[in-house]
Amino acid sequence: MLDKHERNINYMRISLTDRCNLRCRYCMPETGVDNLTHYSILSLEEMARLVRIASELGIQKIRLTGGEPLVRRNVPQLISYIAQIPRIDDIALTTNGTLFAALAEELKTAGLNRINFSLDSLVPEKFKYITRRGDLSKVKEAIFKALELDMHPVKINMVVIRGFNDDEIIDFVELARKYPLHVRFIEFMPVGDLLFWKKDRMMPAQDIKAYIEESYVLTPQKNILGNGPARYYSLEGGEGSLGFISPMSNHFCGECNRIRLTAEGGLRGCLYDKREVNLKTALKNGSSDEEIKELFIWAIKAKPARHHMNNGWGEENKRKMYQIGG
């Protein structure tokens, strides 16, 4: 379905939960947050129904996010439900990786096609610092398990934070050189715990790329499967590729093809737009598929031309990334 800016909206991101087993400093306070109750979030069956309705409007790709999606029970069951919807041709998951290895084979059997790992440091002490409680060895195990199961493309998302992990950029490049991994460097954004956010910690994607090109030859390539916002480059002599995501310095809104569904049923056209359509209430009130479809149409038509994060969005928006879906 086309929005009013002639963008083809064919991708929906679904937050399964606002809970997480980590406490990343730029995302969530150390003490955690007041999590949603079981009764306030969508059931797996409700999520599957909404995916089916959305597919009738042209949604083809689904990504499951959180919080940490794998802290929710029965994720393979949800994936199995979604995989049976005829118009859905791609199911992906974004995870911190700490719980993935034990579930990997079950997830793939259920119908999971692709996986993205959020990983900001390869140094155990720094990883523990940024996550406040994570075990890096579990994430590494998960990444290689995904490769073993041929869940290609396997992507690693690194949020580059100047003064914290910018000295590890080359280490992440080496992962893409040695293994068939697609490493994406993401600009630091004000979308979580604003006490950790400082504008001078944001390293522009063009600076990251220029730094890498001092040591490596990069060649532009077609976008990797996933219809995401990254600009991809092959790495001379490398097994994988590099991607650069620049929401702060060079937004990609003109190509945005996604809508977002929160765990409690809020449908929004943009991560940075505070307007939401409450689908949970519609489901509770017994709305028909056609009535719910009209709510999807409204949300898609209301999708803004671009975000305004550089104009102080972070200070105004009370909803954090773990609540909306990363």
Swiss-Prot record:
Binding-site residues, GTP: R13, R63, T94, K155, R258, I259, R260
Record EC number: 4.1.99.22
Transmembrane segments: none
Catalytic activity: GTP + AH2 + S-adenosyl-L-methionine = (8S)-3',8-cyclo-7,8-dihydroguanosine 5'-triphosphate + 5'-deoxyadenosine + L-methionine + A + H(+)
Annotated residues for binding of [4Fe-4S] cluster 1: C20, C24, C27
UniProt entry keywords in alphabetical sequence: 4Fe-4S, GTP-binding, Iron, Iron-sulfur, Lyase, Metal-binding, Molybdenum cofactor biosynthesis, Nucleotide-binding, S-adenosyl-L-methionine
A Pfam family this chain is assigned to: Mob_synth_C
GO molecular function terms noted in the UniProt entry: 4 iron, 4 sulfur cluster binding; cyclic pyranopterin monophosphate synthase activity; GTP 3',8'-cyclase activity; GTP binding; metal ion binding; S-adenosyl-L-methionine binding
Cofactors named for this entry: [4Fe-4S] cluster
Enzyme class, first EC level, given as a word: lyase
Limits of the Radical SAM core domain: 4-227
Domain of life: Bacteria
Residues annotated for [4Fe-4S] cluster 2 binding in this entry: C253, C256, C270
Role summary: Catalyzes the cyclization of GTP to (8S)-3',8-cyclo-7,8-dihydroguanosine 5'-triphosphate.
HAMAP family the UniProt entry points to: MoaA_B (MF_01225_B)
Subunit structure: Monomer and homodimer.
Family listed: Belongs to the radical SAM superfamily. MoaA family.
The protein's name: GTP 3',8-cyclase
Organism of origin: Syntrophomonas wolfei subsp. wolfei (strain DSM 2245B / Goettingen)
